[in-house]
């Protein structure tokens, strides 16, 4: 399971800046759930082959309602969710009484904690860091989150005890397809798991949130190995029973990150709600293959079914690559068809394609519809090669690639999806500007070449063509 890191500290010490710095890597996922987390923001980030989840909390001052009540809120939950705590302090302000109160609470929770002295630019580190050693929490790490200084060395220290994840293990090839069942509470996730397994392996109650933690279940179907990951559902903040569902968002993000295929279960009777869309976005940004299951479909009348289908067509255009199934997990209607989409999505996400094949597709696409002209010059796309899988990444080389407009990127995505017959997985197309290897050679001439060129120009002037 990937580690969870909470950023804790007083207001305005740079927690959000550090959060943005950590989650701005190429594969970062930033998930700010409106109305769900309020003062907590969740993001997935990566340092080389180490993935981790970051939680940004609201500031703790301890001056208005007291540190105890403040810590009992969002930051306390973040600390409970976390494996590691980054305690952010302000180097310019120095040690503050609120810092000492926060440190006292962190010691009570006995979590692995790193003191991070932010805003160190322009200061003598020895003088600036000295007061924070009085907290008695070990080494103090100097950083300037705004410019990224010291952040990489900090994270290398923090993640040193967490081994890198080999590519093969990330893809789950040894254990078969890993399927994450995600969705809001009480949409029927555990019922669907039991239906897929053919037995009551997961306790099911009517009360939302009875699946407290993610459950990993290994099984085989027709001699093929699978792992089902059942998660606690995501629910609006005001409805969360803290004793039951305080870990739901982190567990859902961890399950998505750990899965090969995500089945998003939605309640057909409620239609499409904002949290469903956020979960779809989370899966897509994580690059996971996606299957959508609308549960409780058999309980709808025809007019309601017609309305829901129209809503799906209108609001889910951004996931038009995902297969949609109308099911009843309770009665088993349509559940068996999910496996075909799971297999298809996994195959599409993990297929390998040759450079020659990808380049031919690119050339055909360019012949059919050329890129636009920028500043009087046509964008040239020369060749393509694979850049990874799960999800498929295609690297396109050419000139002026920074100017390729979004609509042309969409055109290339659709072309590759159609020709490669990819279903259920997002595609990522990245561009590289290729330098002309002969350009420097054209610009520079030897002395002898220069003399010969001048003589030729002089002859041409003296002997003009008639």
Curated annotation (Swiss-Prot):
It comes from the Bacteria. Residues 442-466 are annotated as: Disordered. Residues 351-435 form the KH-like domain. GTP 1 binds at residues 9-16, 56-60, 118-121. Coiled coil: none annotated. Keywords: GTP-binding, Nucleotide-binding, Repeat, Ribosome biogenesis. It holds the Pfam family MMR_HSR1. Gene3D superfamilies: 3.30.300.20, P-loop containing nucleotide triphosphate hydrolases. Residues 3-166, 177-350 form the EngA-type G domain. One of its GO terms (biological process) is ribosome biogenesis. GTP 2 binds at residues 183-190, 230-234, 295-298. GTPase that plays an essential role in the late steps of ribosome biogenesis. Belongs to the TRAFAC class TrmE-Era-EngA-EngB-Septin-like GTPase superfamily. EngA (Der) GTPase family. Associates with the 50S ribosomal subunit. This is GTPase Der. The gene is der.
């Amino acid at each position: 399971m990937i580690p969870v890191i909470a950023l804790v500290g007083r207001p305005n010490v740079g927690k959000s800046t550090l959060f943005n710095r950590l989650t701005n890597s190429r594969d970062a996922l930033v998930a700010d759930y409106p109305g769900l987390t309020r003062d907590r923001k969740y993001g997935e980030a990566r340092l080389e082959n180490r993935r981790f989840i970051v939680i940004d909390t609201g500031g703790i001052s301890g001056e208005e309602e007291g540190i105890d009540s403040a810590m009992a809120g969002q930051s306390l939950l973040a600390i409970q969710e976390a494996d590691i705590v980054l305690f952010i302090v302000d180097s310019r302000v120095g040690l503050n009484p609120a810092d000492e109160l926060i440190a006292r609470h962190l010691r009570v929770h006995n979590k692995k904690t790193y003191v991070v002295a932010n805003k160190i630019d322009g200061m003598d580190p020895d003088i600036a860091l000295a007061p924070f050693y009085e907290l008695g929490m070990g080494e103090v790490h100097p950083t300037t989150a705004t410019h990224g200084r010291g952040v990489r060395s900090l994270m290398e220290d923090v993640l040193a005890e967490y081994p890198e994840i080999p590519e093969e293990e990330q893809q789950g090839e040894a254990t078969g397809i890993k399927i994450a069942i995600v969705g809001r509470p009480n949409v029927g996730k555990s019922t669907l798991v039991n239906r897929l397994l053919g037995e009551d392996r997961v306790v099911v109650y009517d009360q939302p949130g009875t699946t407290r933690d993610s459950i990993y279940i290994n099984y085989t179907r027709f001699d093929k190995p699978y792992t089902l990951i059942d998660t606690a559902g995501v629910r609006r903040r005001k409805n969360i029973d803290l004793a039951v569902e305080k870990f739901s968002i982190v567990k859902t993000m961890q399950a998505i990150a750990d899965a090969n295929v995500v089945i998003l279960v939605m309640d057909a009777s409620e239609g499409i709600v904002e949290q469903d869309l956020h979960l779809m976005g989370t899966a897509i940004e994580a690059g996971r293959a996606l299957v959508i299951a609308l549960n409780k479909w058999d309980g709808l009348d025809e007019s309601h079914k017609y309305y829901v289908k129209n809503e799906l067509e209108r609001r889910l255009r951004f996931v038009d690559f995902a297969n949609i199934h109308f099911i009843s997990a309770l009665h088993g209607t349509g559940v068996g068809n999910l496996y075909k989409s799971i297999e298809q999505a996994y195959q599409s996400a993990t297929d390998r394609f040759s450079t020659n094949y990808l380049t031919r597709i690119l050339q055909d696409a360019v012949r059919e519809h050329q890129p636009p002209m920028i500043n009087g010059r046509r964008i040239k796309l020369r060749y393509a090669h694979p850049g990874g899988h799960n999800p498929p990444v295609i690297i396109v080389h050419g000139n002026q690639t920074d100017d390729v407009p979004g609509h042309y990127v969409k055109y290339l995505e659709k072309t590759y999806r159609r020709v490669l017959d990819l279903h259920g997985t997002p595609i990522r197309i990245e561009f590289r500007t290729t330098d002309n290897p002969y350009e420097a050679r054209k610009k520079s001439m030897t002395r002898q070449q220069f003399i010969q060129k001048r003589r030729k120009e002089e002859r041409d002037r003296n002997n003009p063509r008639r």
